[in-house]
Amino acid sequence: MKTDFTIEGNLVDIRQRSIYPARLVISDGKIRTIRRLNAAKTRYILPGFVDAHVHIESSMLVPTEFAKVAVTHGTVATVSDPHEIANVLGTDGVWYMIENGQKSPLKFNFGAPSCVPATSFETAGAEVTAEDIAHLLASPEVRYLAEMMNWPGVIFDDPSVQHKLDIAKRAGKPVDGHAPGLMGKQALKYISKGISTDHECYMIDEARFKLKHGMKVIIREGSAAKNFDTLAPLINKYFGQMMFCSDDKHPDDLLEGHINLLVKRAVARGIDVFKVLQMACINPVEHYGLDVGTLQQGDWADLIIVDNLTDFNVLKTYINGDVVSERGRDYIKTEPERIVNNFNIGLKKPSDFALPLTKTDINVIEVLDGQLITKVFEGKISLENGLATPSVSDDILKVSVVNRYSEVPVATAFIKNFGLKRGAIASSVAHDSHNIIVVGVTDEAICEAVNALIAQKGGLSATDGTHTEVLPLPIAGLMSNESAEIVAEKYTALVNMARDLGSTLTSPFMSLSFMALLVIPSLKLSDKGLFDGEKFVFCPIER
């Protein structure tokens, strides 16, 4: 039994829209009593923040290391989709995340991945079947059916997709959505299937349409996709249906802040603080039925102390009544984590990346900085002895996807807006199947960047052709077994090297990791070829 203790401060009662000085008595991890006081206090007591949709693997940290950083920013819980590791290791990967997360006080709430592999147009390392989903959802540790990315399968009544939705309905667990740009009759059909959220809205009219028809919209601000500024104007009217999430956040950005930064930005825009805090603290708990306290008598003492309601500097974070962080320092103990992986290929040759073509007019993937969507650019390249060569002056570079699960030919196409003038950058974090993706100026540099990752069985790399830097990610080729600070330092060095090579993207490795994500339009590349994400068919390189 824990010793009772008290916490005093200006209590922010979000539901009652009131702030008053109070003394909380914490007993056995829960709020036993809340007593009003007469004198105002200098600090504020809030419910802890909840990230309503995040892939922990994108931080390149295992859950326990993610938790050590997140709690310093006032995060007490996450709604986490483990489909990244599931694409590599199947349900073994899901349980790896759950078991690792249980070693931490942070309340990780994992979902059952709904689309592994994401499509049939790529090669993943594993499959999560409907039977697997049923077993996962039968477990109390699995809270929901994770994002249904196969929106064509939903709106065209694919039996296998409907079966998964039915399993979630029978289990009484919510279904997360993923339908970027979907509006009108197609969106209505998607919503009618019981899919309740979408974190992929990138247009205000799209988000408004979905909100009007009953969906919950989660405002995303990650390392690559940043939708806060676009969607924030909807908060005043629709705050009861909205939440905040990071989705995919690299370690350097996570060290800077988490959901607390979105709260601060929203309040700075003049949005009512109670509306903002309802999105950050209350709505995810209620929507997903999380076992997370919201500062009510009898709740778990999952709360934070902040200095004011403008900056939201986190002084202390409590989870189940335990202090897990104080003034930027965490109190979470970790232990070495076992290595799991799925990497089955040998080293490549520069000739593996050669691309024979007969035409010089081609379809090019056009990257949009700060977005996961791409455009189709009508580009022109040169041919040398029948082989396509990049046009560095026009910023049209080679992009290749290397299947890491079996020895098959490399898929190569062209991409614009990475800005590299020399060298190459590569990643085994390549949503969602997590093959190796690489962008570069020459076949030799591309091959060097890829081989550096094959040798390490996963990671991120950058090369100028003579010098190569690598951030190893030995756990599933997605996560490090080192601390957030070490990973962030190595990652920042790689980003700086990418910029030295010419990249002008805000987050070149995060953007690179989404260039093989076929379920987000318009043009992407899988290990099987160039893909039209709007028509959901393969696309010729030559025009």
What is each of the regions a protein language model found here?
Residues 50-62, 117-130, 196:
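Active-site mouth loops of central-metabolism enzymes
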Residues 1-22, 27, 32-35, 71-73, ...:
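Active-site microenvironment of metallo-dependent hydrolases
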Residues 67-174, 470-472:
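Divalent-metal coordination cores built from histidine and acidic residues
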Residues 93, 127-146, 153-218, 223-244, ...:
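Histidine/acidic residue-rich metal-binding segments in metalloenzymes
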Residues 46-53, 80-83, 111, 146-148, ...:
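Active-site neighborhood of phospho(di)ester-bond hydrolases with catalytic His/Asp-centered motifs
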